[in-house]
């Protein structure tokens, strides 16, 4: 593309050139590029004039007279044919575009998103406009031939035509229209500066990009791909996997919130007689198909599949009638209809799926249980060990669940009962469809022996083939005859032990409260079709906005961002079997870490674009893009906002004691009452050593600053009380709004507070006599107070509650102190925070006694600890970190337990210790504490 710096008249395209006397053919000065391109364009117009002269008079017309037209990219009719049409009808054909205002019309079949934004205010038409104008012999409205539609953000007006169109062939009207359009272009030329040229060179594109270029020329295809600005919204609204993952995360959070508040503290079980656990594995039968046909008795008896209905769409779910014909989930609709021509394909009904799933989990939550594990929207595991004593009790609960689900949703579920997760899962297979089945340790060998090894969890096709090649093993019964040593030697210590255990029905997986989510991701692997590199950049930006939107809903920040690219595999076809699908691909992954947690678009975008360019995949070969936020933490900005709101309430209701007291309004009293209930930790502190009220002179008190007078008066009133008033219960509406870690901490501290008497802090040496009354040392206390007042003329005492301040993260403490104009020295001299609460374990708190207790526990449980004991001890160590703030004590306990098992190498204990360490390290990570060094 060329830019001419000289002002010159726009060529009109008619034969008005005198080639012999034209200065365009004279020599060009050295390095005078502007003059060179000016002469070059003049020569091209001479060629157009020569072409115009060579055309028969009968084929000429002045239809495009006064219009300058350029062509961009591939067109149909071709570039040469369109040029001849324009020139023969009196138009000026522009081969090199100086700027947007140098032409009247741009003819093209396709524009990239960035070029479309550049030319959105210009007349960009399809090639058909040229052809139809010549056919009808008049200039047609260009708006009907736009290459791209107007932006959805721009409001448009609709007008009803009030006059009939003029008859064809009215030359006067045509010329008037042309002159008006020319006049408009001249106006635009004065308003806009010359823009950068854009004509795309398709010769540099790869074969895959050219294929996508041809594919995207179809507007229906283009609107179904990432080229559509609304693609993400449409994609996620109709994506089955997106709905499943979103609902699963929501159900996990909701169930965790409901169970955490009511979960009892589990003591170490001293009664070892009850060794067996009872688990229920509950699952819908053909969930999507059952929900879609639950109100149609006719469809229930016919083969039905749920899919989008397109031939190359995958079946999400099919009922048992369809499975009789060999149809399976994941099969293409076309293949399924070949097996069963009478197959009925129904579309997705995501609203019904969510409604039924919520009814399902409501029933499970209302069932007596210890824990619930959300597997998917239609499948869950329940631990009901504490609620039953035999398998017969489990059968009754399972049948109750089935009947309630049938009544509420008109769908069927199957239930598997077992002493561990593995056996409950295998029992569920036996129970399907529409039944209940139990599997105990006593009959495990009879049930497992005939099954294939691939029926075991964690055994894939490659491991099964390896077992067959080395040991001739096909069934679980054959696997049971292989020694543990041989399996560990072949597959490694851990996986070999896993194979040995699960073949005998031994499973150490446990069900407990769900851990907080560690990542948030956005993935798209359908409809991804790019032509140019900037297409991928544009879509990547939209994808990042979607990721940040999801992070905002979860109120989290990220420490690490990961980019995933799916590239068309070498030799794979450009068009996969699934319409606009990914097909056979190769995956590329790259991550980048931030020094501090962030949700800044600019910071993350800089990392993402750098990673995208580093991977360097041809844009035409990209078949999928994903972004994942890793190492996410809660955003403390909401906590800061809540704290400021409480602080503002305190400042509004502070009472000044200048001669007269001020009554607090009833509305303010209500606010203060609510504040006491919402913040049980906000206990007033006593920052001064005060004598009794009778020994304080009112004249001396008047010499102090007003803010200090108010604090002293308030403290004197509080000295009359022996016990601080404390709310007996927490507001459940407030607790639900808190993040899970903070809610747990508030519950723990509230329980501690209700089990002991809270007394006011004092910075003097307090002594309590037999009657329980405090004696405050009064020597020189008030003199010291006056000395403090003289050193600082005015102490602006901020409205900060230091017990609350102590519980906040360090960075948030600094921010609040800065905003309150409180120096670090003032905090040290005026306030002493209370000592951390010492947490006991089995009435023991010293490290020496704890070591003895752990040694006794390890020696008695030689076959491995009880899982409830493990959870209880892990929770205790977390409380040491959370309440005592004693990382050294927590570290020494974990090291001692690790050393106890180091010599014995007891595998059950090894797994239990790993579980404890994982829980404790998670607590550290949640509190932004570096991991403890155990090994």
From Swiss-Prot:
It holds the Pfam family IMS_HHH_1. Deoxycytidyl transferase involved in DNA repair. Transfers a dCMP residue from dCTP to the 3'-end of a DNA primer in a template-dependent reaction. May assist in the first step in the bypass of abasic lesions by the insertion of a nucleotide opposite the lesion. Required for normal induction of mutations by physical and chemical agents. Involved in mitochondrial DNA mutagenesis. Residues 184-193 have a biased composition (Basic and acidic residues). Residues 279-460 form the UmuC domain. Its cofactor is Mg(2+). Residues 162-193 are annotated as: Disordered. This is DNA repair protein rev1. Gene3D superfamilies: 3.30.70.270, 3.40.1170.60, 5' to 3' exonuclease, C-terminal subdomain, 6.10.250.1490, BRCT domain, DNA polymerase, Y-family, little finger domain, DNA repair protein Rev1, C-terminal domain. It is found in: Nucleus, Nucleolus; Mitochondrion; Cytoplasm, Cytoskeleton, Spindle. Belongs to the DNA polymerase type-Y family. Mg(2+) 1 binds at residues 283, 378-379. It comes from Schizosaccharomyces pombe (strain 972 / ATCC 24843) (Fission yeast). The record marks 578, 589, 591 as: Interaction with target DNA. GO terms for molecular function: damaged DNA binding; deoxycytidyl transferase activity; DNA-directed DNA polymerase activity; metal ion binding. It is an enzyme of class 2 (transferase). Keywords: Cytoplasm, Cytoskeleton, DNA damage, DNA repair, DNA synthesis, DNA-binding, Magnesium, Metal-binding, Mitochondrion, Nucleotidyltransferase, Nucleus, Transferase. GO terms for cellular component: mitochondrial chromosome; mitotic spindle; nucleolus; nucleus; site of double-strand break. PANTHER family: DNA REPAIR PROTEIN REV1 (PTHR45990:SF1). InterPro entries: BRCT_dom, BRCT_dom_sf, DNA/RNA_pol_sf, DNA_pol_Y-fam_lit_finger_sf, DNA_pol_Y-fam_little_finger, IMS_HHH_1, REV1, Rev1_C. Binds 2 magnesium ions. DCTP binds at residues 240, 283-287, 317-323, 329, 378. Its EC number is 2.7.7.-. Residues 235-245, 310-312, 460-463, 517-525 are annotated as: Interaction with target DNA. The lineage of its organism: Eukaryota, Fungi, Dikarya, Ascomycota, Taphrinomycotina. Residues 59-147 form the BRCT domain. Mg(2+) 2 binds at residues 283-284. It comes from the Eukaryota. Residues 162-178 have a biased composition (Polar residues). The gene is rev1.
